[in-house]
């Protein structure tokens, strides 16, 4: 049943994805705003490591054109020293003779400062030194590198840079793990792209004061939470049934509870999370949701519980009745089978009795005095006794005369063994089959001879 073919009498609210804030494409992923990708972190930036300050208190030495501010006495001493240095340079006097001796063991930051101060004095002391600096512009950078190497922070910086270039296989593993965790978060929220586009037609049945057993319908996508759908449904109830402002607090989201299929719904749940089966593609699924005031929530749940118990009891009674019906059917089938078997046995007994009666009639005709079989000869003919040996190795004795045919002997054996009338009986004497048309005299049988009987 689709939403177009269903006639709806209740007021309906269509939350169109193009006209409401619910369908904003930018709001699809609510939990991914603060996410980040580990791959976006750039570990190859060398500028950060190069801009590390080794010693914040070390001052950069002044340039060649910087001036020193001296007092008057120091200025006169400096001029005299400059003149003496210029004279000594003309006489090829070594500049090291006028250089002040350095302290033996400068400590800490004083060491760097003293070196820098002396370098400044040497630069300003002689023009020849200035020429040397021009010829060797890298001498100052060497002095700076020597000053920087004195600080222990420089060693720590080199160790840090070496650690950044160390490759670890676990880095790739953790990157892949973070990607999988990001994917699983997205999948748990919305399992498939088709499920995000699935449409539901929700019928909100009100149990609130003023709209009891009244309903509104809202058509939404399955990805939206009930916390976003419920305000529109409550507003639709108030507008459709003209609820006064005095009762407005009853229709607030925080004052109501939702129930579906005798179960409580939480506001963060979605229609897709209910896992309602879909009969065909693009089907608009119908959902009936009951709105109950939190004030009567316990009473409603108690009513639901009693209703469930009644349904369970009715289900148990129905199952018991179904089981009894099956047992009764099985019992009837068994009785019918037994009755049929009894009828079959009774029929066989009747047939056997009928055969016996027929055999008795024939036996009466065939048997004569002493159980002997008579032929066409007179009663004065000599009677002899022969044995009929069956396949069960049991003997039946019969009295015959010399004129008794073998056909009558075979018929007598069939009657005594209660065999069917159509049974074929063969007689053998000295391993030769006897002709049923012959008689005892034809085989020269004597008293107490034995004849073998074979049943086909």
From Swiss-Prot:
SUMO-like region repeats lie at residues 169-287, 380-456. CDD domains: Ubl_SLD2_Esc2_like. Residues 1-24, 83-93 have a biased composition (Polar residues). The modification Phosphoserine is found at residues 90, 125-126. GO terms for molecular function: flap-structured DNA binding; four-way junction DNA binding; SUMO ligase regulator activity; Y-form DNA binding. Residues 25-43 have a biased composition (Acidic residues). Signal peptide: none annotated. The keyword Nucleotide-binding does not apply. The keyword Nucleus applies. It is found in: Cytoplasm; Nucleus. Residues 301-360 form a coiled coil. GO terms for biological process: double-strand break repair via homologous recombination; heterochromatin formation; mitotic intra-S DNA damage checkpoint signaling; mitotic sister chromatid cohesion; positive regulation of protein sumoylation; silent mating-type cassette heterochromatin formation. Residues 1-154 are annotated as: Disordered. It comes from the Eukaryota. Disulfide bonds: none annotated. Keywords: Coiled coil, Cytoplasm, Nucleus, Phosphoprotein, Repeat, Repressor, Transcription, Transcription regulation. It holds the Pfam family Rad60-SLD. GO terms for cellular component: Cul8-RING ubiquitin ligase complex; cytoplasm; nucleus. PROSITE patterns: UBIQUITIN_2. Component of a cullin-RING ligase (CRL)-like complex composed of at least the cullin RTT101, a linker protein MMS1, and the potential substrate receptor ESC2. Interacts with RTT101 and MMS1. Interacts with SIR2. May be a substrate targeting component of a cullin-RING-based E3 ubiquitin-protein ligase complex RTT101(MMS1-ESC2). Involved in HMR and telomere silencing via the recruitment or stabilizing of the SIR (silent information regulators) complex. Present with 1890 molecules/cell in log phase SD medium. The 2 SUMO-like regions, although related to ubiquitin domains lack the conserved acceptor Gly residue in position 456. This is Protein ESC2. The gene is ESC2.
């Amino acid at each position: 049943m689709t939403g177009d073919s269903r006639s709806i009498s209740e007021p309906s609210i269509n939350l169109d994805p193009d006209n409401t804030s619910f369908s904003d494409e930018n709001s699809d992923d609510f939990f991914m705003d603060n996410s980040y990708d580990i791959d976006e972190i750039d570990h190859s930036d060398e500028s950060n490591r190069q801009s590390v300050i080794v010693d914040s208190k070390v001052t950069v030495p002044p340039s060649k054109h910087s001036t020193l501010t001296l007092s008057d006495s120091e200025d006169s001493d400096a001029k005299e020293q400059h003149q003496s240095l210029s004279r000594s340079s003309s006489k090829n006097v070594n500049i090291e003779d006028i250089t002040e001796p350095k302290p033996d063991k400068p400590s800490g930051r004083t060491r760097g400062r003293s070196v820098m101060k002396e370098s400044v004095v040497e630069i300003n002391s002689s023009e020849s030194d200035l020429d040397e600096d021009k010829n060797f512009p890298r001498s100052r950078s060497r002095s700076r590198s020597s000053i920087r190497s004195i600080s222990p922070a420089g060693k720590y910086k080199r160790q840090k840079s070496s650690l950044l270039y160390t490759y670890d296989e676990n880095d790739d593993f953790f990157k892949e793990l973070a990607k999988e965790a990001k994917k699983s978060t997205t999948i748990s929220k919305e399992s498939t792209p088709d499920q995000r586009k699935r449409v539901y037609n929700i019928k909100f049945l009100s149990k609130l004061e003023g709209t009891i057993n009244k309903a509104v319908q809202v058509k939404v996508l399955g990805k939206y939470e009930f916390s976003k759908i419920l305000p529109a449904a409550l507003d639709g109830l108030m507008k459709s049934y003209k609820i006064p402002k005095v009762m407005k607090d009853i229709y607030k989201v925080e004052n109501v509870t939702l129930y579906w299929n005798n179960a409580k719904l939480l506001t963060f749940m979605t229609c897709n999370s209910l896992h309602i089966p879909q009969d065909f593609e693009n089907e608009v699924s119908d959902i009936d949701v009951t709105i109950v005031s939190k004030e009567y929530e316990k009473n409603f749940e108690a009513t639901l519980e009693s209703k469930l118990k009644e349904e369970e009891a009715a289900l148990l009674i129905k199952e018991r009745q179904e089981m009894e019906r099956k047992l009764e059917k099985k019992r009837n089938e068994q009785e019918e089978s037994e009755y049929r078997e009894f009828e079959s046995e009774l029929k066989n007994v009747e047939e056997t009795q009928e055969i016996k009666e027929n055999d008795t009639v024939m036996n009466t005709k065939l048997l004569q005095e002493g159980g002997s079989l008579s032929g066409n000869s007179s009663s004065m003919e000599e009677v002899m006794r022969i044995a009929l040996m069956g396949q069960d190795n049991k003997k039946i004795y019969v009295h015959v005369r010399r004129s008794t045919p073998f056909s009558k002997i075979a018929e007598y054996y069939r009657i005594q063994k209660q065999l069917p009338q159509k049974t074929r009986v063969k007689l053998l004497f000295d391993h030769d089959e006897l002709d049923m048309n012959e008689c005892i005299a034809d085989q020269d049988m004597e008293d107490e001879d034995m004849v073998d009987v074979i049943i086909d």
